[in-house]
Amino acid sequence: MDNTTPQQIFSLRSHENSISNIEEVFLWNKHCLISSDTKGWIIIWNINAKRPIRKWQAHDETILTLTLISTNTLLTHGRDASLKIWDISVEHAESSPPELFFLPINTLNFCNVQYFNDFLITPASVDSNNFDIYKITNPEYEFKRVLANFSPFDLYSKNKTEINSPNEQGRNDFGIIMKLVYVEHSNQLFLGFESGQIIGLNINLNPDATLVDKTTEAYSKKTPSKYGGLSSLIDKTSSRTLINKEPRVNLIYSDSSHIPNPITSLVHLKDNILISGSTNKQVIVHHYQMHSIDSSDAHLDVKKVAHSGIQSIVADEKTDTIFIGHWNGVIEGVDYKSNKKKLDSQFELKRDLPHLITTSTNSSGGDTNTIAKEAVKLTSLALSIERENTQVTTTKKKSYKDLVKARSAYIGNDNRLLFAGYEDGAVVAYRL
């Protein structure tokens, strides 16, 4: 990516409430965008046509998690204390899609959930500081809790003497979980807390089961013995029982650099890199060690950015660029591998909005026009999935219909798009 500022190319408007999530997916043999809002509505968009394909109210309150878990299956998780799985195999329909599964879930905090390989990690049902793990059986969608109310703080406390963490002294908890990130290839779970603490765990979801040998003795009714008296006939049977163990959890990372600011964004990249953001101007790039629980063994790049109030961070690893969305509506693009402590923005984006012109009377009695550009709070960021450019060069003269199709294909197949959701319900696309 060069240093030219990405350009706003289109916006999608059908939500009446603040955007809570955005995700681009490949669905129904086309690139689609799924967006959700703070009143529980979901819209699936045709990106090329820039029009809704399906729209329904999935929850009564804010949708916190929105993820496609199979080709035609959507998982949603809302502040109405519910997690649902939907069948979205039908492209066009007026009604809500069939609801395949419903699970009551703790949503006292605004934490997301993580789904992977038929496992689900959620805030614990009895304590928002802890987490539960469920095993999902397909296709019936039967949920079995395999780890209940696990406390990262208790695990941390047991390992406290091994961790060089002076800023964490005196705490008796980490507060509620704000962000969950699961790294599937390494079975790692990273948690960001209300206190600003970050914890990394390794989770063995399938520990070796234990075989228990058992011998059962069955006594028959007593019969006369040839030596006099009574004897018993004993029938011995042996059996082996397989006892499954609950997931094994180990502490692999701990950092308190954000304390006392709550974690608002957490992103994991390849090569053991974790990027975290909080409510201030601080972004931290964690180069952690796989088998060390001491943050002093990690290389921490503590960066200052231009604006406070970090709402969302997404990363483009091909260009070493992170896009930081702030509450004030500004999106910064910065090089996360820069050696500078204060990151220079490669660019700053701010959504194009109509100018508001106000008229007032000055001291001489004349009218004065004031032009102001309104700011709208940014609520969500997402990068488009990678795609091939399908434009075909031809010398044949194109009809108007062909030109319209070509323009749609160009928008839909450009290298990368950055999507931003806003408080007024708009989703805006920027070409990178």
UniProtKB/Swiss-Prot annotation:
Keywords, comma-separated and alphabetical: Chromatin regulator, Nucleus, Repeat, WD repeat
Example GO biological process: chromatin organization
Subcellular location, record wording: Nucleus
Pfam families: WD40
Keyword RNA-binding: no
Listed GO CC annotations: nucleus
Cysteine disulfide partners in this protein: none
Residue windows of the WD repeats: 14-55, 58-96, 100-144, 258-296, 395-432
InterPro entries linked: WD40/YVTN_repeat-like_dom_sf, WD40_repeat_dom_sf, WD40_rpt
Described purpose of this protein according to its UniProt entry: Component of the ASTRA complex involved in chromatin remodeling.
Similarity comment: family membership: Belongs to the WD repeat ASA1 family.
Subunit details: Component of the ASTRA chromatin remodeling machinery complex.
Designated name of the protein: ASTRA-associated protein 1
Lineage: Eukaryota, Fungi, Dikarya, Ascomycota, Saccharomycotina
